[in-house]
Amino acid sequence: MTDPVRRLLLIKPSSLGDIVHAMPTLAALRERFPQARVTWLVKRQWAPLVEVIAGVDQVCSVSEGLRGWLGRVPDLRAAGFDLVVDLQGLFRSGAMARLSGCDRRIGFANAREGSSLFYTQRVAVPPAPMHAVDRYLLVAEALGATRPTQPRFEFVDRAEDRQAVETMLSRAGVAPHQPWVAMNVSARWETKRWPPQHFAEAADRLSQAHALPVVLIGGPAERAESLAVTALMRTKAIDLTGQTPVGLLPGLLRRASLLVTNDSGPMHIAAAVGTPVVALFGPTDPVKTGPYGKGHVVLSHAVECRPCFRRDCARAVPLECLTAVRPEQVVRAVEQQLERSQKPGSL
């Protein structure tokens, strides 16, 4: 008989979207091990998001670089974990699982960089393509959890966060209860970014045809992409890029009527909080990493080489899979989404 699990370490250091994908697995593990105290190991930049995920008892944040990771080993060993779940599946995460001193370590059999060698239990992944959310849930099932009919994404709903969001929107000119469209124009890969002129035209059309405020969001590193869009807009731009702490993103996107976005972390947060998404996909596969659940729209242009998962493009028409999606297609998708949405802002 397996000893009870009272101290559980979940390793999912990055990135924003992947952390969101792991939330239903956390919820399933909490049901499977209700007495367990759960610690989540995460990179420092994403720790504020994990702090607002329901069911996390402690956040163990790590700084960049080998020294930052190894500096956390004494803390992990002192915690005396009964079970370590590695959802990252890379050498560094597998090594941290082993260095934690825990005798029971689980991860994927096909984990990369040899990380599966550090596990005492390896979970097979079927060959057919599946969404990352469902793939992570395989680990919970292997540990005896019941697969949920409706995977749960639950953030802590804090009054101070709601107030901070309303204050931010009010200062930007968005009235309480006013419908608005969020727009995320950046992505980590350049090949995942819809052209700024397309975003600008879509924003102008929405503002002019429906008097919908379009609010650009993103982190400080995305300021240049947002400025490139606002410089091309003819209508008034509301740009909150760089002004939203990552821990407030769930509350901000919950307040939005809809999100127009590249394949990015905010896309997954919006889907998690129930906000409809219109997503632009180029080299990546929405079957594996698209907005999870029903009620979302993915737009892309069919070419024979997609999904290629490349960070460069050698086609005669560069990034045709993405750039061939026209602004009018996005506007039409937004209109259709808002018409059938139950969120405020139906047209």
Give residue ranges: language-model regions.
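Catalytic machinery of carbohydrate-active enzymes
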Residues: 1-347
